[in-house]
Amino acid sequence: IIGGMIAGTHGEHVISGYGHYAGLISIDDERVLAIHVDGVGSKVIVASLAKRYSTIGIDCIAMNANDVVCVGAEPIAFVDYLAVRSPDADMIEEIMKGLAQGAREANLSIVGGELAVLPDLLADEFEMSKGKGKGKTRGRGKVKERVDNAFDLAGAVIGIARKDELILGESISAGDVIVGIASNGLHANGYTLVRHLLLSRYRLDERIDELGSTLEDELLKPTRIYVKPVLDMIRSMDIHGIAHITGGAFKKLTRLNSNVRFVLNSMPEPPSIFKLIKMHAKIDDAEMYSTFNMGIGLCVIAAKGDEDAIISICKNHHDMDAYVIGKVEEGKGVYVNDIRLV
């Protein structure tokens, strides 16, 4: 229903709209604008609880720029929307530092933004599952956690591409190779589950042996920005498809092409945070690989034989680990280690 309503607004300049990683607007015979909007989700609650705001802006840039580059567009401009319960100058400055750092990493310009003060809309407390959090033993049920200043953060990005260089997934075919580029932890998805699951058991400032760090250090790792290595790939070889592994995780591969089968049979060992989540949540692999990135933040699909060049660009030029994680076959769906996700 929503898709139909949106499609009904499309004029002659719209090339691709609802459903892909970015909306595409023709601006002349050769070039298109790619437009995308996204937020950081409930990761902002963790930042509020920890009173640590310096990396959340990186997440906001990453969630937008990574999606635009998936269609072969170079992100060039960004605007942000920051809503706060009260105008805390120090907090706002820290958030803006992260946005500026993310913009530099993505090589784009922040050209505008909006600051909204919304005390009646943003809560100053959040419902949490009961448990040990804060070092106190609690009973079953729910408790409230208070924060000094709730906020929300979102943004929109514009990218530009040549029409003949768009990457929309139509050229993906059986025999192609799938290369996965490593993530930097959870990135910005699954935080509602993680917050209720882990903060009921651990304090944010508690060091967890399985992680080798405090919980807040792990949960506030910024989303990795893949713009520069992907643009290097696009400029040097024929890339058939790119998937940013966010909400929906590996099921998102079908967004690229629903007429082939994506077989992920060589996935790396998941990082410790995902093992910790699985242990406490007691959910199976199908659910994990449908919810979390499991250590792979971006999938790049190309002809067999190009995998070494893709991995070299990531490792040698951008210090990112990358692996061959699977292949494309005839059929339909997404499979991880023989488990069908969709």
PLM region spans:
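N-terminal glycine-rich phosphate/pyrophosphate-binding loops that anchor nucleotide-derived ligands
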Residues: I1-V69, N107, L118-L121, K142-V143, ...
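Acidic, glycine-rich loop-and-beta core segments that form the ion-binding/anion-interacting portion
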Residues: A174-S213, D217
